[in-house]
């Protein structure tokens, strides 16, 4: 399964399993404790960013349809304004690059693990307005903190990517973030949390790429920057990103989102000076888990392209235009409530 969870030996020798199950259990319990310590009680509902972006680009072409799936990071937990959420940042960035409106819908659920992707994908595919052009998935942190078996986690993600790709959507996965950056987690537990996160991220890369998706590594991108600037890049709960933190993640993912739709000016030409190359997918996944903002895209099996796309500054924070104000009926909705019983209303 996902090359035996990307063979933990790729991260400095030896699998996490060799360290001992008791130690792994201890670090994951410590992360759970850290979440309780920094969360400050029940987290507020993330602002809804559903709607249309780039209305100034309206023309004869239909708007691009973009959906974000995943957990609290995808939902934008920790910020107060819709325009600061990763979905809004990515949708406005897509609109600016494509010079075309983007209809955005977010089905992510705070607290979700990879086994919730089945429900989220079903919501996406049941939309009467049709299959989205592009889906992005940000998932994995809760799988680690709740000790979901990595094989199950990767299987759920792979199935989600396959269903979306079969339906005709492009898919980009932002892999598991670096849990070693949570401030109340101290050494040596911080080191082990980072190790487990990277191992899952590498396995997610293999699973997603083998199903026709692309991945962008978030762990090593956010890790050093969050560690160096925790007050700026973490939100008030010291667990979820701040607006600046979400912007950092969005800047890393936007080039790959655009490239998946043929919108990015760079081709898939490999630049050796940027440490790009064609590698076996397992090796590409291992490198991506260690290198900031690395994209991995499937090539001819068992090979994959490893790229470091140049980033652009994101547009200024943009609030969405509700769909009822655009004169269109997109069939999109906003989620209210938590858990599998969450309901939807028209946007």
Give the ranges of each region predicted by the language model:
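Substrate-gating cap/lid alpha-helix
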Residues: 182-217
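Short, conserved phosphate/pyrophosphate- and ester-handling motifs at nucleotide-, phospho-/glycolipid
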Residues: 242
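Surface-exposed cleft-lining segments at the edges of enzyme active sites
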Residues: 76, 106-114, 141-151, 189-193
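A short helix->loop->beta-strand "cap" motif at the edges of active sites that frequently abuts
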Residues: 167-169
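Structural beta-sheet core signal
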Residues: 68, 137, 172-173
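Oxyanion-hole/transition-state-stabilizing segment in secreted/luminal serine hydrolases
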Residues: 115-154
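Conserved catalytic region of serine esterases and O-acyltransferases that act on ester linkages
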Residues: 2-33, 248-347
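Serine-esterase "nucleophile elbow" of acetyl-processing enzymes
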Residues: 29, 33-108
């Amino acid at each position: 399964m996902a090359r035996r969870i990307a063979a933990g030996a790729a991260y400095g020798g030896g699998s996490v399993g060799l360290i001992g199950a008791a130690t792994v259990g201890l670090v994951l319990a410590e992360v759970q404790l850290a979440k309780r310590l920094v969360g400050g009680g029940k987290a507020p509902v993330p602002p809804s960013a559903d709607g249309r972006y780039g209305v100034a680009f309206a023309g004869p072409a239909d708007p691009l349809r973009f959906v974000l799936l995943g957990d609290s990071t995808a939902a934008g937990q920790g910020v107060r304004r819709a325009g600061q959420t990763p979905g809004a940042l990515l949708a406005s960035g897509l609109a600016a690059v494509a010079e075309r409106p983007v209809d955005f819908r977010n089905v992510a659920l705070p607290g979700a693990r990879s086994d919730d992707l089945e429900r989220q994908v079903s919501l996406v595919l049941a939309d009467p307005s049709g299959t989205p052009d592009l889906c992005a998935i940000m998932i994995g942190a809760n799988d680690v903190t709740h000790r979901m078996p990595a094989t199950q986690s990767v299987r759920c993600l792979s199935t989600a990517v396959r269903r979306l790709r079969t339906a005709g959507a492009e898919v980009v996965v932002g892999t598991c973030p670096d849990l070693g950056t949570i401030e109340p987690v101290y050494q040596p537990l911080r080191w082990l949390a980072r190790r487990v996160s990277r191992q899952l991220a590498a396995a997610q890369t293999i699973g997603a790429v083998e199903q026709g998706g692309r991945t962008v590594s978030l762990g090593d991108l956010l890790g050093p920057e969050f560690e160096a600037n925790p007050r700026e890049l973490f939100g008030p709960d010291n667990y979820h990103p701040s607006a600046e933190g979400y912007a950092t993640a969005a800047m890393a993912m936007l080039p790959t989102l655009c490239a998946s739709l043929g919108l990015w000016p760079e081709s898939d030409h490999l630049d050796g000076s940027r440490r790009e190359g064609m590698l076996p997918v397992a090796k590409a996944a291992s490198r991506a888990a260690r290198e900031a903002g690395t994209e991995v895209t499937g090539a001819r099996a068992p090979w994959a392209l490893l790229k470091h796309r140049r980033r652009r500054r994101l547009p200024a924070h943009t609030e969405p235009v509700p769909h009822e104000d655009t004169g269109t009926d997109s069939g999109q909705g906003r989620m209210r409530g938590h858990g599998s019983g969450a309901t939807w209303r028209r946007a």
